């Protein structure tokens, strides 16, 4: 799993397009990005699965997320986050 400093450094290259970022250390989710249009991007890590989950939610409707993507390769994680940003701001 990415440690917090590395996580923040790698995320610094992502344009969150006005989203409000919150980072946590040693917790799930690792990061949330809130948007004024009601979208939320949640990035979490499940250790027992060795998998990151990037979930896009609209209007706090966790029962029916807009998209959830499972990622096991850290190098792919940030491209999935970028796709989630585009989905959140484009809708």
Q: What is each of the regions a protein language model found here?
A:
Residues 10, 27, 47, 72-75:
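Residue-identity detector for glutamine
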Residues 41-72:
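Intrinsically disordered, low-complexity regulatory segments enriched in Ser/Thr/Pro
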Residues 1-38, 63-65:
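Negatively charged, low-complexity tracts enriched in Asp/Glu with abundant Ser/Thr
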Residues 64-91:
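Ampiphathic alpha-helical segments that act as solvent-exposed interaction surfaces
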